[in-house]
Amino acid sequence: MNELLLNVVDPLHQWFLGLGDGGVLLWTVLKILLIAVPVIVTVAFYVVWERKLIGWMHVRHGPMYVGMGIFQAFADVFKLLFKEILQPSSSHKAMFIIAPLLTLAPAFAAWSVVPFDAKLVLSNANVGLLYLLAMTSLGVYGIILAGWASNSKYAFLGAMRSAAQVVSYEIAMGFALVGVMIASGSVNLSQIVFAQAGSSGFFDWFLIPLFPLFIVYWVSGVAETNRAPFDVVEGESEIVAGHMVEYSGGAFALFFLAEYANMILVSFLISIFFLGGWLSPIQGWVTADISPWVNWLWTGGWPWLLMKVFFFASAYIWFRASFPRYRYDQIMRLGWKVFIPLTIVWIAVTALMVFYGVIQKGV
């Protein structure tokens, strides 16, 4: 991977810069495509995996046609793109169209600072953690706008639920990341991973000393993405599809894409903040040099990150198939009366662990 960056990406970057302002613009467009295209393709296969896994849990087959079910999601996208986008006559026309774009843009923009390996990151920003908090907070504005612009009581009720839920759990997520920042001494995502490197393998990860914050961040991530059992925003039995009830065709597909892109993003972030990112769980236990195709098992690399992400992404599906939906008041009580006090207490505990040397990589 490093050879690819050195021999292909860097010369290509310099060539674009040599074209002047137009080259800079083209390079920016290329970087946007490098984010958007892999995310869209990953979401498509993730949807197929979700339908297959839930099918197996329900003792069904799941998708079986369109390439044995593998390309079912692509067929669904093709169908949605050619459906008519209907707008309620009483809706606010401009805001109705802007809302799904405003939801999708932050979901894509957040990926620009996510490191896949020590050298594989689009923008190795020194304030990556703060940037992520900002981007993940912006998506709710599109949801609120969709509920208001639809001029529907069901859509507006779903939007208000989403606003309250996201604000509530955003606080808990932010406090959980304060603990990560104290333990690592950095807000750079790559440096947070390096702070978990050591000769003890997974014992050096933040999962063990910050376990309560890990649970809070994981559950809050599920609530932030409005997934089961926290899916009161679009509870089918109560408010049909919530803020998306008046949307159809490509506009509905954009909301759908943003939701699943955020689910995969949260899976990446949990792996980076608490499970050592691309680090191997047995790093430092084996020092043999066999071949580059085998060494990653104990030295770490992007395959380890993808395996961790796959586990958390599959857990989203397991939650959906297993747990009943919480009531709205139960969700609010969990966020405000349990998670926020717990994170505040554990921030103090983390500071003490850093001060007394229990966590060696802190400030």
From Swiss-Prot:
Keyword Ribonucleoprotein: no
GO cellular component, one term: respiratory chain complex I
EC main group: translocase
Keyword tRNA processing: no
PANTHER family for this protein: NADH DEHYDROGENASE SUBUNIT 1, NADH-UBIQUINONE OXIDOREDUCTASE CHAIN 1
Protein family per UniProt: Belongs to the complex I subunit 1 family.
Quaternary structure (record): NDH-1 is composed of 14 different subunits. Subunits NuoA, H, J, K, L, M, N constitute the membrane sector of the complex.
Protein name per Swiss-Prot or TrEMBL: NADH-quinone oxidoreductase subunit H
Organism field: Xanthomonas campestris pv. campestris (strain ATCC 33913 / DSM 3586 / NCPPB 528 / LMG 568 / P 25)
